[in-house]
Amino acid sequence: GAILPLEQLLQQVLQRYPGSKLLEAELEEKHDVYVYEVELLTSAGIVREIKLDASDGRLLKDEEDD
């Protein structure tokens, strides 16, 4: 199926963590499911790993990255 543009989903993620910086973003595909994996450095200095469903923008994972 179609996937949403990364830029659109990044805005959603950056609104969740204002003042954060994007470290890395990549599109992954497993079993015909596309997932954006995004790493952010929050304003508090914490790295967060966020996974979004690329087809509908659903948040799949949001946790501190060690």
Give, region by region, the residue ranges found by the protein language model:
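Exposed beta-strand-loop-beta-strand "reactive/processing" segments of non-cytosolic proteins
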Residues: 22-52, 58-59
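Short, low-complexity, Pro/Ser/Thr/Gly-rich segments in the mature regions of secreted, periplasmic
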Residues: 57-66
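Short, non-transmembrane alpha-helical segments in secretory-pathway proteins
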Residues: 1-21
